[in-house]
């Protein structure tokens, strides 16, 4: 994952010892993991869940604190009906987000699981799929 973030010139703090992390108030953990490792990773951990955004990368977040919950709170705060909201996603960590809005749009390169819950599918992210979708819908 360090190499992944280095691509965008982002610096990443890497904890060498998990005991050091437990001393801090942690809101999210990003780590490399495969689906077959999830159960072992969360063994003994209370109130957390894994959302995968790549087949080798996951976020560990508090239960009910994912993108969907965030969208719902924002819609409520600003008084926006979910039918008036849309979201784009490409990974399994976007499933709850797409379910929380009136129009959930999966990218062409999205996971099959995300496409299954999407209302629509637009072009690939590498081919400016969001831009072309917005052009087609006369949003821009």
Predicted features and spans:
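Short, acidic/turn-prone active-site loops that include or flank metal/cofactor-
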Residues: 55-58, 109-112, 126-130
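Generic C-terminal helix-cap and adjacent flexible tail
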Residues: 136-140
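Conserved acidic, metal-coordinating active-site core of Asp-based
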Residues: 1-88, 92-97
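Short, charged, surface-exposed secondary-structure boundary motifs
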Residues: 60-64, 115-121, 131-134
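Well-ordered alpha-helical segments embedded in enzymatic catalytic cores
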Residues: 70-73, 129, 133
